[in-house]
Amino acid sequence: MKKEISHLIMLLLIVSMLAAGCRRTEPAQTGKGSEELQSEQGKGERKAEDADIITLTSEMVSLEDGFSAVKYTGDYKLDTFLEQGGASSDADVMKFLTKHLFSGKSVLEFFGNLFGCSTLSVQNADGSYLFGRNFDWNTCDALVVSAEPEEGYASISTVNMDFIQAAAGMELERLPDEMKTMAALYAPLDGMNEKGLCVSVNMIEDSASIAQETDKKDITTTTAVRLLLDKAADVDEALELLKEYDLHASMGMMVHFALADTEGNAVAVEYIDNEMVVTDTPVVTNFYLAEGEKHGIGTEQSHTRYEILTKLLKEKKTMDGQDIRDALDSVSKDNFDDPSSTEWSIVFHQGSGEVWYYHRENYEKAYRFKIK
């Protein structure tokens, strides 16, 4: 019976692209201005650095309702995935994972949903750089994944575990943690590696998509994030890696990447008519930033969030981790008449390898992690 049940297990790995908010029609914007933000920055100590650094193991640990973390050390077959040509579709990723990571016993299916985010890159007073990230969606289960591959850079990334579900009458909680972790390794939505390279995927609400068709190897959106975290030390290396592959947007959704490194390089990578376009920018939300006919296409709320963060960066040339937290708070979903929420906010300390997480807009409580 156990053997029969194991053959019925189905993981549904939902690879989503990022959109501003979870609805196609966004509600009115009431985001905080910079003066209101600055008045709040002095409220309470709320020092994230006072929190203990969380040590992770291969045992998945629940930190609070809807927020867990795990560590994986070893070979999760990324090199094999790339060497065999990558994947030009979510179904192809499914086939690879089924064959190489689940002994052919599991079947993966991929679906898409809409969600949004904001990112910003800024220098600290000590000369190092910080990268902030908000993930906006419905209430979900978030998983922090610390990865230490045999070949590649160590990293910390985040996965929406609502994108991994169990079928055949089994609940996700009953699946082995290692199976869930393996699937999550191929579904990062953001992250930073030991070299300080930060990567985030943001959706652009547009009818166009990305389907590059040349003789290059193929990658999908979240496998591109995993590729960059494992193989790129800085923005230049990340861009060169992306040029080596044909990108295929999962579920046909238009995306752009926000990349930032320890030298202060911060760019948006967009695909217009299947051509990669790179724009220098410290702030990325959910509209096209490249000059041309697509410039500005996106949601109204994403423009509001972009304007708030851009104004903050002009007024405050350097920021520390608390400032980044407050900046992310200023564009979180509780500032808008929006039924969705900011499920997680992250402050990446690119110089030290520290990562601070804030869950569901509770900016009073930080979870500290450190790469290696």
Give the location of each predicted region.
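N-terminal mature-domain region immediately after signal-peptide cleavage
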Residues: 20-226, 230, 320-372
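A short secondary-structure junction signal
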Residues: 143, 210-213, 240, 268-272, ...
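Extended amphipathic alpha-helical segments with heptad-repeat/coiled-coil character used for oligomerization
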Residues: 252-290
